[in-house]
């Protein structure tokens, strides 16, 4: 049996305890993170999480040991996400917030040949500080529309030179670095996170917050409206249900002419409007001065309202059509009765 170094045993024990002490366990890739940025990230995580970098084999042993001692086989599922230079990040922050924090903590970095682009890389249109030279031909060879303007290299239009996931070539890395475009990111890349028996991958954690907030708001409004319409009282809907019932009862009272403290004003207003409509049909000599004044005011209000030209034309056309139909009907009657 091969001898196992004591430091390895101690490391596995410490990692196992760390895994048991926190509800959220994440694996992060630290392979491409330089020492100084990594130390700055440790500082930023100090009050939020604990980062421990170790050998992949020791992390795997610690996960198996912790899963066995916690009687949680799901914890072992993290092992399949170990890759590259892996670190353990333990925290009390839920996986979604942790993922967002790590993504926002990433900093731009210069192009590096052989590295995959984390997202589409765009060379923007406009002048550059670069002087004419062989670089112009290199740009054009890569599909970048470059030419000389006022003694400097100028890009004619925004150009996507690399799609997300594609590998940066040495030629493109040289051009991007001279243009000052930093397509890469330096930061902790979350490989997977575990909480309460569930392993979350980055694809699951990368949610569109605005979209989900909008979906929740819509769901809330639909549930609210359903509760109000079926008169199902809750803390959130009881006020709206009472208001709806009150307005419904009031409308019934107004339509039926049943006078109450709440409906009297609307009933009188309705009666007043009906009275004015009747007054419009009566001969003017039968009206008193007050009624004439009210009718005159009403006519002025109606006249002051703008009438769209299209609606007016349609109305004229409708009237002409009606007159034509009446004339045709009369002609038909005349022919029928000789």
Swiss-Prot record:
GO biological process: cytoplasmic translation; ribosomal large subunit assembly
One Gene Ontology cellular component annotation held by this UniProt entry: cytosolic large ribosomal subunit
InterPro entries listed in its UniProt record: Ribosomal_protein_uL10, Ribosomal_uL10, Ribosomal_uL10-like_insert, Ribosomal_uL10-like_insert_sf, Ribosomal_uL10-like_sf, Ribosomal_uL10_arc
Secretion signal, residue range per the UniProt entry: none
Acidic residues biased stretches: 310-329
Subunit architecture: Part of the 50S ribosomal subunit. Forms part of the ribosomal stalk which helps the ribosome interact with GTP-bound translation factors. Forms a heptameric L10(L12)2(L12)2(L12)2 complex, where L10 forms an elongated spine to which the L12 dimers bind in a sequential fashion.
Recorded family membership: Belongs to the universal ribosomal protein uL10 family.
Official protein name in the record: Large ribosomal subunit protein uL10
Gene name of the encoded protein: rpl10
């Amino acid at each position: 049996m091969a001898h196992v170094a004591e430091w390895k045993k101690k490391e596995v024990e410490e990692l196992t305890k760390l895994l048991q002490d926190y509800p959220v366990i994440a694996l992060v890739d630290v392979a491409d993170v330089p020492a100084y940025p990594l130390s700055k990230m440790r500082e930023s995580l100090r009050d939020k999480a604990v980062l421990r970098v170790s050998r992949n084999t020791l992390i795997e042993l610690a996960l198996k040991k912790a899963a066995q001692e916690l009687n949680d086989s799901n914890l072992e599922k993290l092992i399949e996400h170990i890759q590259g230079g892996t670190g353990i990040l333990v925290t009390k922050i839920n996986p979604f917030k942790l993922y967002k924090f790590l993504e926002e903590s990433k900093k731009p970095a210069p192009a590096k040949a052989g590295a995959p682009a984390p997202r589409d890389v765009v060379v923007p249109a406009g002048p550059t500080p670069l002087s004419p030279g062989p670089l112009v031909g290199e740009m054009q060879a890569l599909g970048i529309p470059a030419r000389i303007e006022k003694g400097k290299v100028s890009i004619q239009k925004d150009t996507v030179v690399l799609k997300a996931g594609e590998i940066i070539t040495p030629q493109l890395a040289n051009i991007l670095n001279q243009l000052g475009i930093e397509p890469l990111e330096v930061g902790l890349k979350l490989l997977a996170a575990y909480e309460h028996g569930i392993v979350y991958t980055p694809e699951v954690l990368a949610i569109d917050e605005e979209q989900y907030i909008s979906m929740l708001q819509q769901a809330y409004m639909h549930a609210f409206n359903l509760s109000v319409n079926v008169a199902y009282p809750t803390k959130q809907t009881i006020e709206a249900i009472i208001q709806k019932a009150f307005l419904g009862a009031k409308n019934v009272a107004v339509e039926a002419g049943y006078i109450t403290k709440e409906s009297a004003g609307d009933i009188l207003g309705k009666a007043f409007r009906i009275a004015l409509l009747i007054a419009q049909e009566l001969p003017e000599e039968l009206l008193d001065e007050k009624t004439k004044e009210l009718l005159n005011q009403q006519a002025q209000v109606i006249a002051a309202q703008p009438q769209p030209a299209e609606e007016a034309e349609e109305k004229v056309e409708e009237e002409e059509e009606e007159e034509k139909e009446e004339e045709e009907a009369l002609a038909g009657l005349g022919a029928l009765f000789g």
